[in-house]
Amino acid sequence: MFSWLIPDIPELFLTISVWFRLQGWEDNTKLGFIIGNTLTTIFYILRLAQDTLLAGVSRKLIRDYELFDLSKSETLLSDPAFSSYHDVLFNKHHSTANASSYNKRVRKVTSTVYWSTYFLLLLSCYTCYRLFNTYKVYRIYYLKDLNLDKHPSLKKIEPDYEVDEKLLKTSLKSKLLSRFIRLLQLQDEVETELPKVTEHYTLNKWDPSKLIISLSTSFSPTIIICLMYTNVTFLTVIPIIIHQGIFYFMIWNRYEERFKDDALLMRENYLQYDTKYVKPLKQIMYQDVMTDTATISDGGFTKFFPVSKSTLFKHHEMSGDVIIERYNKKSREFENVTDIIKPHHHINNTVKILPPTIRKDHKTNRYDHRQQSILKDRKFNIDSNEPQIINALTTAIPSRSFFNNNPSGSNDDNCSGIKVRSSPTRETFFPATPLRKK
């Protein structure tokens, strides 16, 4: 039977350790408040027992009552004059023996309470130490500023990256021998992945867990030290409750909610930046149509609305690298996008635009600006003798099929033209004119 249980013992310990890791104790704030308030209550009860119950008894135990006892002398007991007092001395001896056993019990209880209070005091100081000594180390490579040396959390290190020796020593001491090979592999990977820069900094960010914060605020060393070196009575519970309430209100209802609000605002700013700047660079605007053929007898229902579709495709190689590609309609192949900041839907064509030809209409007394151009091979070709040439990265898109939504539904040719999209947020409209013959 025991031979069956022995192979299952490592699996049992592994299951228990995995279960403890999956519980998420670091983020359990409710558990920290329960444990901290319970320990504070226990410390208050121990100090109250010391000052009210054990203080008077401990004063009596300071003197030693084990003096020389004449009733134990055999010479005096053989004397007939002393025998009359023998019974009285015998009863007194039994009473002192009972008192001594009672005193021993009181001393044990007093010492237990005394060491328990000091243990709770050290435990509170340890939680406070864990609160203020929990950091995450980050390496700053690309931030260049003249005031970085004055930052209290930044530390300048050597240009060449070296693995921390303390981390290696602790890893080698705590891990098994089989982890040594994996540690060397990770060291090689980190050295190859890190960029080669001239100098960099290390940032020690204070990052305690929520469990430690809740435990330290509910079992703080301030209230423990005050209870340790003051006279505790029944009315002392009132300032304890006020202290716990102020700490809870200040740390969680205000300070912790501020971090949540900052994270929410940061997310809102990120989404706003992504909507206004990133998506217009990565996506193309199309015009979709939605029709309802069920009511075709009544004229039907047609609705045009703009949509954005991305032409970037992301996939992973076998090595784990992320590759971003786009489809080239000319070559009918996928191309790697090396610079995604560049608008992928803009074509690097040279657009040559003539200055407008001004013609005065005598009937309306207005000037008609017309642009004479020839659209050929997605370029505007003009005479080379014209003085003004504007070079832009644009795409000529028919305005009616993509951007011009005529709500009246008319097919008037006067509304036709070409929209030149020079940026994701700016569009220029040039009226279409008859092509000029060469």
UniProtKB/Swiss-Prot annotation:
Give disulfide pairs as residue numbers. none
Q: Where in the cell is it found?
A: Nucleus membrane
Q: Which UniProt keywords apply?
A: Membrane, Nucleus, Transmembrane, Transmembrane helix
Q: Which InterPro entries does its entry note?
A: Nur1/Mug154 (IPR018819)
| Region entry Disordered, spans | 405-438
Segments of skewed composition (Polar residues): 405-414
Pfam families per record = DUF2418
- List all membrane-crossing ranges: 109-129, 219-241
Key word Iron present: no
Q: What does this protein do?
A: Member of a perinuclear network that controls recombination at multiple loci to maintain genome stability. Required for rDNA repeat stability.
Kindly provide the name given to this protein in its UniProt entry: Nuclear rim protein 1
